[in-house]
Amino acid sequence: MKFGFIAHPTSVGLKRYVKMIDLLQRNSTELHSGYKRDLWRRENLVPFMNFAKITSATGATCEGVIKYMPLVADEMLADARGIANRVVSGIEELVEDGAELVGLGGFTSIVGRRGEATAEKSPVPVTSGNSLTTYAGYKALMQIQSWLDIQPEQEPVAIVGYPGSICLALSRLLLAQGFSLHLLHRAGHKDEDELLSHLPEQYRSRVTLTSDPEDLYPRCKLFVAATSAGGVIDPYKLQPGSVFIDVALPRDINSDTRPDRDDILIIDGGCVTATDAVKLGGESLNVTIKQQLNGCMAETIVLALENRRENFSLGRYLALDNVLEIGELAEKHGFLVYPLASYGERIDRQRVINLKRYYHHDIYSDEPDTEQPPASQLAFIDAIIAQDPAREDTLDRYHQFINPMMVEFLKLQHCDNVFRRASGTQLFTADGEAFLDMVAGYGCINLGHNPQPIIDALKAYLDAQGPNFIQYISIPEQAAKLAEVLCHFAPGNMGRVFFSNSGTEAVEAAMKLAKASTGKAGIAYLKNSYHGKTLGALSITGREKHRRHFKPLLASMIEVPFADIEALRQTLSRDDIGALMIEPIQGEGGVHVPPPGYLRTVQEICRQTDTLLMVDEVQTGLGRTGKLFACEWEGIEPDVLMLSKSLSGGVMPIGATLCRAIFGNGPYGTADRFLMHSSTFGGGNIAAVVALSALREILAQDLVGNAERLGTYFKQALTDVAARYPFVAEIAGRGLMLGIQFDQTFAGAVGASAREFATRLPGDWHTTWKFLPDPVQAHLKAAMERMEQSLGEMFCMKFVTKLCQDHNILTFITANSSTVIRIQPPLTISKAEIDRFVSAFATVCDELSTFLE
């Protein structure tokens, strides 16, 4: 059976989209067949999509055609009689195309007395689609009610658009479930008895009528809307926790884009999604229109699949039996109300559950109490602390309160793990599944997770009730010990230490020290470097993607090309440059190791130009590369040295900025200046106790030697695997700081795709391209190149995904390069664990080796 469907754009933007499709379609036909006057004539309907064959989940089939009437709602209402005639003409066009049933979308049914007048003139049966639209809205609300764990008698529901056919049917369904309703009608409906007459008498006591939306905002948090006018409800007046199911089109929320509120949820109601078992015509690359189909169109498809050539869903009164029947038939054929969506984007159960606190005030309370925390507040925090959350609970809590994009990114990569326990090189989920950690907190966890000697030292200090944050009213004993140990082991003649809480703070301290001790504003840094994301550290980070959104950054910071000695010499010879910030290995830059002798030459130039040499060992320091400090590989003696990450074995935040005593005494050696740089938490005894224990264990367990021995073995084993696969460009790094550089190039792929389509599609699209304006061509070419780059990054991320999903191994990319996977395991890693990684890496390489160049 073949159906037809008459849609219409629901906004000016969609009308212009249809206009674009129409222009391109006619132009394509002209390019293929030549100019014909009839091709460029006024049309009643615009062709949009042909479904050559639709196969449902049951195996039933039908075919259909969708055409647009290129008018928005206001244009239709301005000439309702004329549009009604155009709808009938459109039906006749579809019948000529073989349609045996025609669906009327949105206003194309409203202008014909909700389809009744249209049906009288139509040569074939018609449907408004309102029954399945109603069913979808109803099921969405029932699911929301279940997820929020509320009973019908607890929360009233606002119905916006009563007594329209959808709202009337919804009202009757909800009243039968026990809900109380607030019905919003047009201001012109004054006769309340007449309005109530549409509802069964036994339910009318649970109904409140109003024509003013303002009445709804303080009374209701659950809304279902289906007006013909649209734009009725102000989303910024909704109560926190409100769920607004916007059934059908036009939108009844007065916003074309998602409102900037996290405490409400607006759901695209009245839609269904086809399951994988449904085939809507030819499908290629899993690309087809199957999600969030309007209920009116889906109802037409379902009736065609059932071979039901009958009028359906006509008039104001939709038979509830029909509503429930078409819903069940839709589900049978594979058209489901779930997943739900908001402005086209999927939403899941937890997104709704996050709103429960606005409904269950016995558990969640915001009542203030100035004297003492009320019992409800204590109950809330006690419940949070005691909770044994499911993985999804944690993901959604993080999504709601910390970083939603991070959660969505990890979900996209299938790496959205939540770990409960950690030991050594392993991380464990709540159900005990173990993962090998090859990231180790980006180099923090040198001693492995929860190293017992450090835990014992920390417990002993706490059990002895040792003091912690006393550094500005007394002299902290443990911090003093740690400073001496660091100065003893660090290369060069270090004599001063400033403690902080992180690597970026250590860098900030070094920058201030450089300015104060040299009297010069400028600091040089290397291209592709990474020193942190606070404003100062970002100003000397050589990667534009981290910087662009925070400009202007600090002035007088000068970038120098990596490994370019002459450029460095010229820069450091400038009068305004007082210091150079450098990493012995660019970790986040993609694990770039400088050429042999480069660092030694850098030191010589710094000495010749009287430039402060500041070495950032936040990631490379304390054994990671096979030396206690990576700069020792070339005998470098910095003027300033920065440490963090593994300084505490990853157990506690700590950073340290070391310098020669002469540089520390100068800017901070007077009565007015000795407290010019300070940190509330920096230099606390507890962090120092942990750091002292960590340094001891690095030496006691010979982790520096372990990093060198196993790192050499590891790098060679990976290199042997990589030699078989040209998409692995290099195994870079030193010790147990390695990077796998991928080069699966897609250069030219998008351009070739465009040319292929231009060649295969009807017409001469190559000529069309030639006459696009130069700026348009330039932007399209830039977009194609960036897309090709993104495909290479996507390929790299598939390694991260497959190592995680298939082998329970955790890896990640570097901050500056999305085509480099970092390998920075705990220095306690065993040879067997390295072999496990190499084997898994080889397997993934083989599985992703369909294309070799």
Curated annotation (Swiss-Prot):
Disruption phenotype: Cells lacking this gene show a white phenotype and produce 4-hydroxy-2,2'-bipyrrole-5-carbaldehyde (HBC), 4- methoxy-2,2'-bipyrrole-5-carbaldehyde (MBC) and 4-hydroxy-2,2'-bipyrrole-5-methanol (HBM). The keyword Transferase applies. Disulfide bonds: none annotated. Pyridoxal 5'-phosphate binds at G503, T504, T680. One of its GO terms (biological process) is antibiotic biosynthetic process. Its EC number is 2.6.1.-. Its cofactor is pyridoxal 5'-phosphate. GO terms for molecular function: identical protein binding; pyridoxal binding; pyridoxal phosphate binding; transaminase activity. The modification N6-(pyridoxal phosphate)lysine is found at K645. Pathway: Antibiotic biosynthesis; prodigiosin biosynthesis. The keyword S-adenosyl-L-methionine does not apply. Keywords: Aminotransferase, Antibiotic biosynthesis, Pyridoxal phosphate, Transferase. It holds the Pfam family Aminotran_3. SUPFAM superfamilies: NAD(P)-binding Rossmann-fold domains, PLP-dependent transferases. It comes from the Bacteria. Involved in the biosynthesis of 2-methyl-3-n-amyl-pyrrole (MAP), one of the terminal products involved in the biosynthesis of the red antibiotic prodigiosin (Pig). Catalyzes the transamination to the aldehyde group of 3-acetyloctanal, resulting in an aminoketone, which spontaneously cyclizes to yield the dihydro form of MAP (H2MAP). Belongs to the class-III pyridoxal-phosphate-dependent aminotransferase family. Homodimer. This is Aminotransferase PigE. It comes from Serratia sp. (strain ATCC 39006). The gene is pigE.
